[in-house]
Amino acid sequence: MNSYETKGLSFESPSFIEWLKPQSSTTSSKSVLYRGKTRDAISRSNHHQSQMNMLERSLFLYQPQEPLNTSIQCLPLLNKLMENNSQASDIKEENKDDVVTLQIGFPKYHRGSSEDGSDITFDHQKKPIKREIIEDGVVMMKKRRKMKFDEEIIDSDVEVCGKRFWIPSPAQIHVGPMQFACSICSKTFNRYNNMQMHMWGHGSEFRKGADSLKGTIQPAAILRLPCYCCAEGCKNNINHPRSKPLKDFRTLQTHYKRKHGSKPFSCGKCGKALAVKGDWRTHEKNCGKLWYCTCGSDFKHKRSLKDHIRSFGSGHSPHPSLLFDGFEEDTECVTTE
């Protein structure tokens, strides 16, 4: 016996083996009932929480809509501002009727009619352009923009961006800008002094001295102006993208005859047709003749041989026969006939 028993106290405790044994059925049933109650409480709380979430979602998604017929009412200050804006827009719409539309770019020109003889007008202004009539009857016209020229106004002298030029018609190119007619035989001349010299042949009464050959009407001023070609598609036409005017009227005449005119002159040796009489004479003079170099090359023109020698330098020189005759003095070249 231990000390507890000696003192009259007793404590019964289960042994270690009994403690290891499984509990009775009563305790197990109690634990099962407790677990079932906790599960029911948890399920009830979850169901209640889901109902609350559904209610919150419905309240959040529900937005009251106003009927379509309701009108928006602004504050008094906003009403005043809106009235002022409406008045300003009305004023602007009234002013729009008085605004003149402007055309940006180069103005276009077309043929018109007016009392003072000027027949060129703007498309958007319909105002005649002031034009000067010079003494020889050629109409002068001043403009500041690049224009498209019709066939009817090709014979006008124009000033564009400070540069004056002239576009003669085909008739003026063939016969000259003007003709002088003899009052007796009606023969025409391109130059006034030639007409006066012709008049001397009709009698001594027409011989008024050398001063009479100068004349009072000379188209010298316009003949010195740069000229554009009137032929369509020509590189010297004003409508060409890379157009470039010719030096003067005489140069234009030669250009037109060579490029766009007939070729009445033909070489008697090779039959080549030429338009300018001077070109025909030069061609017949040198046709069939060759200029030889010491390297064996031959050229149809003397200038071509000179260019060949200048380009290749040493080892190239004129043929000995040319040097013997004087190559630098425009001697006759070696013939192939």
UniProtKB/Swiss-Prot annotation:
Report if keyword Nucleus is assigned.
Answer: yes
Q: Which SMART domains match?
A: ZnF_C2H2
- One GO molecular-function annotation for this sequence? zinc ion binding
- Zn-finger (C2H2-type) residues: 180-202, 228-260, 265-287, 291-316
Q: Which UniProt keywords apply?
A: Metal-binding, Nucleus, Repeat, Transcription, Transcription regulation, Zinc, Zinc-finger
What positions belong to coiled-coil segments?
none
Predominantly, its location class is nucleus
Q: Which InterPro entries match?
A: C2CH-3rd_BIRD-IDD (IPR055187), WIP1/2/3/4/5/6 (IPR043584), Znf_C2H2_sf (IPR036236), Znf_C2H2_type (IPR013087)
Q: Which domain of life is it from?
A: Eukaryota
Record-level GO BP terms: regulation of DNA-templated transcription
Gene3D superfamilies per record:
Classic Zinc Finger
Q: Motif Nuclear localization signal residues?
A: 257-260, 300-303
Q: Which GO terms describe its cellular component?
A: nucleus
Transmembrane feature ranges: none
Compartmental location: Nucleus
Q: What does the record give as the function of this protein?
A: Probable transcriptional regulator.
Q: What protein family is recorded?
A: Belongs to the WIP C2H2-type zinc-finger protein family.
Q: What protein does this entry describe?
A: Zinc finger protein WIP3
